[in-house]
C-alpha cells in the first residue's frame, strides 16, 4: 500500500514542511520509512521531525 505522510522538520532557518509518498505494509512502517529518509537526506534526528498526518494514498 502507499501512504502519504505530511509533516515538518527543523532546519537552521526554521521548520521545513514536507510531503512524502512511501510504499509500506502499514502506517507504522510508513512512519519508520519517512523518519529514515528525512534523517538520512537532511541529517535530522527523529525528535526534530514532526508528523502532522498519515493517510493512505
Curated annotation (Swiss-Prot):
Keywords: Ribonucleoprotein, Ribosomal protein, RNA-binding, rRNA-binding
Entry keyword Lipid metabolism: no
Keyword rRNA-binding tagged: yes
Molecular-function annotations in GO: large ribosomal subunit rRNA binding; structural constituent of ribosome
Any single Pfam family the record assigns to this protein: Ribosomal_L18A
Coiled-coil stretches noted in the UniProt entry, renumbered to this chain: none
Entry GO terms, CC: ribonucleoprotein complex; ribosome
Record-stated family: Belongs to the eukaryotic ribosomal protein eL20 family.
Protein name listed in UniProt: Large ribosomal subunit protein eL20
Lineage: Archaea, Methanobacteriati, Methanobacteriota, Archaeoglobi, Archaeoglobales
Gene name of the record: rpl18a
